[in-house]
Amino acid sequence: MGEKVYIFDTTLRDGEQAPGFSMTTEEKLQMAHQLAKLNVDIIEAGFAAASKGDFEAVNRIAKEVKGPVICSLARALESDIEIAAKALEPAERKRIHTFIATSPIHMEYKLRMTPDQVLERIKKAVSFARNFTDDVEFSCEDATRSEREFLYRAIETAIKHGATVINIPDTVGYAIPEEFGQLIEDIMNNVPNIDKVILSVHCHDDLGLATANSLTAVKHGARQVECTINGIGERAGNAALEEVVMALKVRKDFFGDLYTDVNTKEIYKTSRLLCRITGNFVQPNKAIVGDNAFAHESGIHQHGVLSHRMTYEIMNPEDVGFPMSRIVLGKHSGRHALKRRLEELGFKFTKEELDRIFEKFKELADRKKEVYDEDLEALIYQEFMKIEDHEPVKVLHFQVQSGDNMIPTATVKLEFKGEEREASSTGNGPVDATIKAIQKALGIEPKLLDYSIKALTPNTDAQAEARVVLELDGVKASGRGVDTDIIKASVKAFTDALNRAIVRKEYIIQRQEIREEGTV
């Protein structure tokens, strides 16, 4: 057996800090269960001290998700560490991840602390965290812009006082692979007792080099990689888990006997679940999980793949769970056929949940002849991944008049926090008129940042999936809606995004106060 590279997934912490990617507690829980199926080693469930919402999410995940180590981020402050420890109490296996900046620019302008004061803070934070768990990770924020000798001292201090994992973040995505690899090698050669801990890396993608830097670090001695599904994260994002894991698996000729315990057959499903939850879909040419990742249009390429797959493909689509067959269900399909297909897609439900899904499936099958996998995924999302049981805005009814040489007009009746309201409006089209009527009824006008709609499946009776990104008082949120009627799909997407913005507004403002002080 070779050497293991630990996969530390921070989708639910660093990943969801990106604008438009915030998740509710229930959504985080859905993702955490799937990450456990993916078999990542560590799930960073959130930043428990950031807000009540973050605390609840970390606590629920610690209580309900089994398998991976559950981790919470905490600044190098006793108050943060105590809150993280409290949130993690139910976890079978837990880790506290504490951090402080070590670069001159951060120490002088953000922390307003001397290097000696920072070292003292590291000592106290790591020692205090060890009172709650034997698994403590310490991160040197902005490590790649830190003075080398001071970085060594900071790491040595953390190890001396009980850190079990040392993380080297390229916080601003500044590093180039060759120099980042050299940094890891220098740390391995110059820090006493570095062999007693796991050396970790956390790379941002500002220069498009996060995956390359992470892999170079592994080659030079790092044995934990912090990454996110689809590479999501602040600014340009993080190293993509799927890219790091598959590079190590496919290029064993280069990386030797290094391996991960990730169940790669769950990669595609995990990627799709994140897309559904956040409403942000990966670009078609995204490595490993994009729609075109295993598509071939060139005649020469098609001929080669048909002759022998490995002529133009370096991995099997099945290795990442990429669906190669499309099973079509219809109105004559029974409960057993539906249950079997859902299980093949990786979904498992109780009898009561399956009854709900089957009822919705039959309604959908009556409206369209053929029900594809994409339809089933959308149906499950609509039924089981709503943002809240109580939504602030509920559209009760709407009617639209539109046609050739007519001004599109919409009338909407809705409920806002229990109060019924009604309004009418005209617009540049039926969707525009309906959205304006909703805004008029609510008395608010969020800024629409993006709107798109696409057919999920072939044929004119296909379900449409609408996606909306909006901003309400500085809070960005995305929503999606699915229906065979494109106006209904658009209304669902708009109200979904609006509800998310309303629910998250205070939550995000609270967390912003913490985030301004820095994260890795």
Curated annotation (Swiss-Prot):
GO cellular component, one term: cytoplasm
Membrane-spanning parts: none
Residues the record lists as binding Mn(2+): D14, H202, H204, N238
HAMAP family cross-referenced by the UniProt entry: LeuA_type1 (MF_01025)
Location of the protein in the cell: Cytoplasm
Domain (Pyruvate carboxyltransferase) ranges: 5-268
Recorded name of the encoding gene: leuA
Keyword Metal-binding included in the entry's annotation: yes
Organism for this UniProt entry: Aquifex aeolicus (strain VF5)
Assembly description: Homodimer.
Gene Ontology biological process: L-leucine biosynthetic process
Lineage of source species: Bacteria, Pseudomonadati, Aquificota, Aquificia, Aquificales
Protein name: 2-isopropylmalate synthase
One Pfam family per UniProt: HCS_D2
EC code: 2.3.3.13
Pathway the protein acts in: Amino-acid biosynthesis; L-leucine biosynthesis; L-leucine from 3-methyl-2-oxobutanoate: step 1/4
InterPro entries xrefs: 2-IPM_HCS-like, 2-isopropylmalate_synth_dimer, AIPM/Hcit_synth_CS, Aldolase_TIM, LeuA/HCS_post-cat, LeuA_allosteric_dom_sf, LeuA_bact_synth, PYR_CT
Location, primary (coarse class): cytoplasm
Record's keyword terms, sorted: Amino-acid biosynthesis, Branched-chain amino acid biosynthesis, Cytoplasm, Leucine biosynthesis, Manganese, Metal-binding, Transferase
Substrates-to-products reaction catalysed: 3-methyl-2-oxobutanoate + acetyl-CoA + H2O = (2S)-2-isopropylmalate + CoA + H(+)
Family, similarity comment: Belongs to the alpha-IPM synthase/homocitrate synthase family. LeuA type 1 subfamily.
Cofactor or coenzyme needed: Mn(2+)
Any one Gene Ontology molecular-function term assigned to this protein's record: 2-isopropylmalate synthase activity
Function according to Swiss-Prot or TrEMBL: Catalyzes the condensation of the acetyl group of acetyl-CoA with 3-methyl-2-oxobutanoate (2-ketoisovalerate) to form 3-carboxy-3-hydroxy-4-methylpentanoate (2-isopropylmalate).
Regulatory domain: annotated span: 394-520
